[in-house]
């Protein structure tokens, strides 16, 4: 059970502690932040509301711990990461349990998230020892006007303190996707978990604690982003911010100083369906892509752009599959569970009502109880409806009928977002041309958008982000290139 056994020390009465200087602590604020269970809409957990002084203390510790961590051999950093991964996987139950309770993720998917996170940490350790163990050697005489008098050696050095801010929907996985690359690269790490998802993150951090990382190297500050977010992101000790979430990321980017930013933000992933597509395959992918975790994925299918000639048939197939989705508690592995908050449910409802007023075809009756919204397919959506452009982050999928492929591409490219997209056709040549024309970070051919596997590059164009994720890209982003040039008194060439 969460907060018991191996994890008992992370709890103080009914409030979870924060983590600093290698210890679990109670905030001097005397205040806590409530975490609501999205399904019951009752307070499930409480976490510390950390103060600015506590943030300052953590940053000082992170700065000094990083100096000695950077001198720790790569293989030792990797060894500790492997240890943390093993502890995490061995103790998946309390983390999965808290994911169910604080973000209403179905029980099976919650376990998958923790296991995937352990695998990500291990992969990162292995990738890190390889790519950070290599550098470059350049010779001066390849540039015009130079003899071979200079040997240039390059290597990758850490940035310093990395601030990691993940979102609610994959709190554990999107936290470790920032923590593991930061640590293997020799950085220290300050984590600000999402409020919904904080308890799962605190358990995950305890796994790193149990693995024996040096004191101060990893910290976890809890509190509402709206209250301590600016103080954290504008803190002078921070040398890199890795953020995943919504528009907040855009304002952080504007306020952050001259530091590397990794921003994975919202998306309006389009699914373009050509008239030669395998419609059974498309229908299954719309269900998986649009309704998994009740549509609360940045990579969810958020608009279907289907050729008019096959639209009726596709809509019928999707409708039949929607009817089979189960709706209910996450504990019972229901396909559709309560969305994360009442404000989120209200926002989704706003999009649905706007589509209703403007004449969209409802393939199912709209139904909502508390934060639980029944899966809904909206046909005949038009560009004047909000749902054609905004991301619901809920179990609602709009279908726009198109008369040409160009119309589909234009709709996709007119979005402010550019995260992922997908195209369904049996003609691979057409698929490649469409993929090249879509202004998104990734295009999936004949499958729904997805971030995983976690070592693939993952990035958004336009308002969907800055930089690229994926294990290798994250390690690279969290390092800087350092060069040393050896100057010879006379040119030297190897002979023979
Ligand atoms: N591209 C991608 O990889 C992904 C994108 N997303 C996007 O994220 C959104 C949903 O996630 P959600 O968690 O609601 O996103 P938010 O942007 O609301 O929150 C993300 C994180 O930022 C924190 N935060 C809030 N305000 C501030 C602030 N002023 N300064 C610093 N941090 C702050 C939050 O903390 P707190 O919870 O305490 O408010 C949370 O940890 C969707 O738009 C979705 O598309 C989601 C997942 C992946
Ligand atoms: O937050 C998200 O939506 C995730 O980054 C998506 O991950 P997935 O595509 O692997 O589910």
Curated annotation (Swiss-Prot):
Pfam family, one: Aldedh
Annotated NADP(+) binding sites: 192, 195, 230, 391
Residues annotated with Phosphothreonine modification: 4
Location within or outside the cell: Cytoplasm
Modified residue annotations for N-acetylalanine: 2
Family of the protein in this entry: Belongs to the aldehyde dehydrogenase family.
Primary role: Important as a means of generating NADPH for biosynthetic reactions.
Protein name stated in the entry: NADP-dependent glyceraldehyde-3-phosphate dehydrogenase
Organism, as annotated: Arabidopsis thaliana
Encoding gene per record: ALDH11A3
């Amino acid at each position: 059970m969460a907060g018991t056994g191996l994890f008992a020390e992370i709890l103080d009465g009914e409030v979870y502690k924060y983590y600093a200087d290698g210890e679990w602590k109670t905030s001097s604020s005397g205040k806590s932040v409530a975490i609501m269970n999205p399904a019951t809409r009752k307070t499930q957990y409480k976490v510390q509301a950390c103060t600015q002084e506590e943030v300052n203390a953590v940053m000082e510790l992170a700065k000094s711990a990083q100096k000695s961590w950077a001198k720790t051999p790569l293989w030792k950093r990797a060894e500790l990461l492997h240890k943390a991964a093993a502890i995490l996987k061995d103790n998946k139950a309390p983390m999965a349990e808290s994911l169910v309770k604080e973000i209403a993720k179905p029980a099976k998917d919650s376990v998958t998230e923790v296991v995937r996170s352990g695998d990500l940490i291990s992969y990162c350790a292995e990738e890190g020892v390889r790519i950070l163990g290599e550098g470059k050697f350049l010779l001066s005489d390849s540039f015009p006007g130079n003899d071979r008098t200079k040997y240039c050696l390059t290597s990758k050095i850490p940035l310093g303190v990395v601030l990691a801010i993940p979102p609610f929907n994959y709190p554990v996985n999107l936290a470790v996707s920032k923590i593991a690359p930061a640590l293997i690269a020799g950085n220290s790490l300050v984590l600000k978990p999402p409020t919904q998802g904080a308890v799962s993150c605190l358990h995950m951090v305890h796994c790193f604690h149990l693995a024996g990382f040096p004191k101060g190297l990893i910290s976890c500050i809890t509190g509402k982003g709206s209250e301590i977010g600016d103080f954290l992101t504008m803190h002078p000790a921070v040398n890199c911010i890795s953020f995943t979430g919504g528009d907040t990321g855009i304002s952080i980017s504007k306020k952050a100083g001259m530091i590397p930013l990794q921003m994975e933000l919202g998306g309006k992933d389009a699914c373009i369906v050509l008239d030669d597509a395998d419609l059974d395959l498309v229908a299954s992918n719309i269900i998986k892509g649009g309704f998994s975790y009740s549509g609360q994925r940045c990579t969810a299918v958020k608009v279907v752009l289907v050729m008019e000639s096959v639209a009726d048939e596709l809509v019928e197939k999707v409708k039949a599959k929607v009817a089979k989705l189960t709706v209910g508690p996450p504990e019972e592995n229901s396909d559709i569970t309560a969305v994360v908050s009442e404000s989120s449910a209200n926002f989704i409802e706003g999009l649905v009502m706007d589509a209703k007023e403007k004449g969209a075809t409802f393939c199912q009756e709209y139904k909502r109880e508390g934060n639980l919204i029944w899966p809904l397919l909206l046909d005949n959506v038009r560009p004047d409806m909000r749902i054609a452009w905004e991301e619901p982050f809920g179990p609602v999928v709009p279908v726009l009928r198109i008369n040409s492929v160009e119309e589909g591409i234009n709709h996709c490219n007119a979005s402010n977002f550019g995260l992922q997209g997908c195209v369904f056709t049996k003609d691979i040549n057409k698929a490649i041309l469409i993929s090249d024309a879509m202004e998104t970070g990734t295009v999936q051919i004949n499958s729904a958008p997805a971030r995983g596997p976690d070592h693939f590059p993952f990035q958004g164009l336009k308002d969907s982000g800055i930089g690229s994720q994926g294990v290798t890209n994250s390690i690279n982003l969290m390092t800087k290139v350092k060069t040393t040039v050896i100057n010879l008194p006379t040119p030297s060439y190897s002979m023979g």
